[in-house]
Each structure stands twice: as structure tokens, then as C-alpha cells.
């Protein structure tokens, strides 16, 4: 998106990005579709599930980094599939080893397989260890404003509350909690999980989120590459609308044209 005079840059760990759309790499039919969708999205940050995707830990198997180059994209390793703080910390350390000292990670510690809700207790434990270990932690969490505040205060560089359950496409289920998190935010707030279509992404940005991370909404679309492009423009439209400031809602009608000087 071209720079807007009254906008502030989207910055993570000291690096500024033009795109406010972050995308995942799972659930595509093959690596070529993955590559094409990510390119169409315009995203600069690509998140990778270290426990599910080969980024060098399995020599001889197809390597995602052969099609998603770390020279072009910021690779964001994530801890999807981890259900304890210990597993999440171990996974982040593996990613750092595989990516030559890479410090930026997305922490997620899940509570159970059915809901994939974040386990906030284990998340807090893992975040504390990772921050002390020198990682730049972006953290997937619930939409509880108190937990979001605690994660920011302990040193997470971005807080990523869910908009809906992972992979459901339900959209922004609780915009009111998100608004409270955004009002109190001292670090970037990104919606993570729940987005189903372009309008959901736009709503998240209109609320004031710095960015949106998504995977299923693109990968599960009938045409993932086309949906990726739609999301690119949805994010831009939402950001512009947020900066422009929407008109206030009113109970009664208000004519667009003044009544003075009517032809009679």
C-alpha cells in the first residue's frame, strides 16, 4: 500500500513492512499453489509451522524455503501443534538453529485439538522463557484484554488475539474485546485466526489492528490465488477506512443535500 501522510509504519523487531497482511503456508494442495498465493497476497511476512513443515530439518524431502525464499520474505516460524510451554520453547530453538540465528517467532500454545483455543497459562510460561532467551516473540492469545496486556508488559513485541477459532472462518466474533485490547495496546495488535473472507479482514483493520495474519481463509478458498489478491486489497481498504474515520451512526435519516434553496 502506498504511504499515507497520517499513517504510522508497520514495524516489527526494528523492521518496517509495507504490507499489513501476514500469511501462512499450510493447507495448500502443493508448493506451487503455496508460492502463487503468497505472491498474489503481496505479503512480506510468511509464517511456517516448524513441526509440520520442512524448512531443512528433513534432508531429502521438499523444502518450503526452496519456493518461499528467506531473501525475499521474512520467515516467521510458529509453534503450531504445541500443547505445552516446553514443546513451544523447544520448537522455537529448533527454528533458530535451522534459520541461522533467526529470533522472530510466533508463539502459540494450544489447549486442545477440538477448539485450538490458546492455553494462556502455558503461553505465559513459554513467552517468559523465550523472551529471556533473546527471541522476539509475537504471541497468539485469547481476546482477553488482561492477558493481552500481561503479554505486552512482559516483553512480547506483538499481541495476536484470535478473532474466531482457528480454521473456522467465523469472522470477527467479539469486536468489543478487540477494541479494548486496541485501546490499551502498547505493542502492535494483529488479528490471528477466524478470518473467512475479505470483509472480515477489512473489519479487523477498520477496528485499528496493525495487521492481520491468515491461512485457512486463503488456502481453503475455491480459488486460493484469487482470494489472496482479494485479501491484499481488503487489508488496504480497511486501513484506509480506519485512517479516514467513519461517519457516526445515527438513528434517524440525514439528507445529503441541504434543504435551503430548494426549487419550488
From Swiss-Prot:
Q: Which GO terms describe its cellular component?
A: cytoplasm
Reactions catalysed, as given in the entry: [ThiS sulfur-carrier protein]-C-terminal-Gly-aminoethanethioate + 2-iminoacetate + 1-deoxy-D-xylulose 5-phosphate = [ThiS sulfur-carrier protein]-C-terminal Gly-Gly + 2-[(2R,5Z)-2-carboxy-4-methylthiazol-5(2H)-ylidene]ethyl phosphate + 2 H2O + H(+)
Give GO terms for biological process.
thiamine diphosphate biosynthetic process
Q: Which residues form the active site?
A: 106 (schiff-base intermediate with dxp)
Alphabetically ordered keywords of this record: Cytoplasm, Schiff base, Thiamine biosynthesis, Transferase
User: What are the EC numbers?
Assistant: 2.8.1.10
Pathway entry = Cofactor biosynthesis; thiamine diphosphate biosynthesis
Binding of 1-deoxy-D-xylulose 5-phosphate: at which residues? 167, 193-194, 215-216
Gene Ontology molecular-function annotations: thiazole synthase activity
Q: Which Gene3D superfamilies match?
A: Aldolase class I (3.20.20.70)
Q: What is its main location?
A: cytoplasm
Where in the cell is the protein located?
Cytoplasm
Kindly give the InterPro entries that the UniProt entry links to this protein.
Aldolase_TIM (IPR013785), Thiazole_synthase_ThiG (IPR033983), ThiG (IPR008867)
Record bears the keyword Ligase: no
Q: What does this protein do?
A: Catalyzes the rearrangement of 1-deoxy-D-xylulose 5-phosphate (DXP) to produce the thiazole phosphate moiety of thiamine. Sulfur is provided by the thiocarboxylate moiety of the carrier protein ThiS. In vitro, sulfur can be provided by H(2)S.
Report quaternary structure and partners: Homotetramer. Forms heterodimers with either ThiH or ThiS.
Q: Which family does the similarity line name?
A: Belongs to the ThiG family.
- Recorded protein name is Thiazole synthase
Amino acid at each position: 500500500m502506498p504511504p499515507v501522510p497520517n499513517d504510522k509504519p508497520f514495524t516489527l523487531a526494528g523492521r518496517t513492512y509495507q504490507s499489513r497482511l501476514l500469511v501462512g503456508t499450510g493447507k495448500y494442495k502443493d508448493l506451487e499453489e503455496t508460492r502463487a498465493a503468497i505472491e498474489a497476497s503481496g505479503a512480506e511476512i510468511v509464517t511456517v509451522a516448524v513441526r509440520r513443515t520442512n524448512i531443512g530439518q528433513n534432508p531429502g524431502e521438499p523444502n518450503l524455503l526452496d519456493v518461499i525464499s528467506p531473501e525475499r520474505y521474512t520467515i516467521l516460524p510458529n509453534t503450531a501443534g504445541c500443547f505445552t510451554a516446553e514443546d513451544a520453547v523447544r520448537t522455537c530453538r529448533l527454528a533458530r538453529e535451522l534459520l541461522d540465528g533467526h529470533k522472530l517467532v510466533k508463539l502459540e500454545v494450544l489447549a486442545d485439538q477440538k477448539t485450538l483455543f490458546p492455553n494462556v497459562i502455558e503461553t505465559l510460561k513459554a513467552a517468559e522463557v523465550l523472551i529471556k532467551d533473546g527471541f522476539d516473540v509475537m504471541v497468539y492469545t485469547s481476546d482477553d484484554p488482561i492477558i493481552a496486556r500481561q503479554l505486552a508488559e512482559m516483553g512480547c513485541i506483538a499481541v495476536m488475539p484470535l478473532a474466531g477459532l482457528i480454521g473456522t472462518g467465523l469472522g470477527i466474533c467479539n469486536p468489543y474485546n478487540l477494541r479494548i485490547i486496541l485501546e490499551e495496546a502498547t505493542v502492535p495488535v494483529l488479528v490471528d485466526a477466524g478470518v473467512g473472507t475479505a470483509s472480515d479482514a477489512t473489519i479487523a483493520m477498520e477496528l485499528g489492528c496493525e495487521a492481520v495474519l491468515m491461512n485457512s481463509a486463503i488456502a481453503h478458498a475455491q480459488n486460493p490465488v484469487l482470494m489472496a489478491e482479494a485479501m491484499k486489497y481488503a487489508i488496504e481498504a480497511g486501513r484506509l477506512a480506519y485512517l479516514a474515520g467513519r461517519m457516526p451512526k445515527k438513528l434517524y435519516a440525514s439528507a445529503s443535500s441541504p434543504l435551503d434553496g430548494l426549487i419550488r
